[in-house]
Amino acid sequence: IAADVFEHVQDTYKFLKKLKDKGDFFLFNIPLEISLLSMIRKKNIFKHSFENVGHLHFYTKRTALLTLENIGFKILNCNLVNNRFEEFKKNKKLHSLIINIPQYILEKLGKDLACSIFGGYSLVVLAK
């Protein structure tokens, strides 16, 4: 299990190649911080993530899966998890709910689209 790990590692490819030799099945949780909203908002999410949580690399669903596939992992299953809704469930602040209504509506049309526009998701990947 590598949950929220390889975005912190300087040489992601080297790390993942070594990891691949250590087992048969792998479960990854990868934060997806690149979105349309993250590119246009005034607050620099990339600087914030680097300074506060130490992320050296940033991913979309596609780039995360390509990274794993390029190393030689076979993707068995993947699922998008909306971290913002989980955060709202914890603190239940009204402004948090209101801000997330457009994302919630768009998610009903498709998680991939909502993730690409709003961000705030993680990708859970089962690989071999």
What is each model feature region?
Residues 1-40, 58-68, 73, 119-128:
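Conserved SAM-binding loop
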Residues 2, 47-51, 109-110:
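A near-ubiquitous, low-amplitude feature marking generic local secondary-structure context
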Residues 25-27, 50-55, 99-105:
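Glycine-rich loops and low-complexity Gly/Arg-rich segments
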Residues 37-43, 49-50:
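Acceptor/aglycone-binding surface of glycosyltransferases and processive sugar-polymer synthases
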Residues 41-45, 77-128:
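A C-terminal cap/extension of S-adenosyl-L-methionine-dependent methyltransferases
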Residues 46-63:
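Acceptor-substrate binding/catalytic loop of class I
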Residues 51-52, 66, 97, 114:
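Short linear sequence motifs
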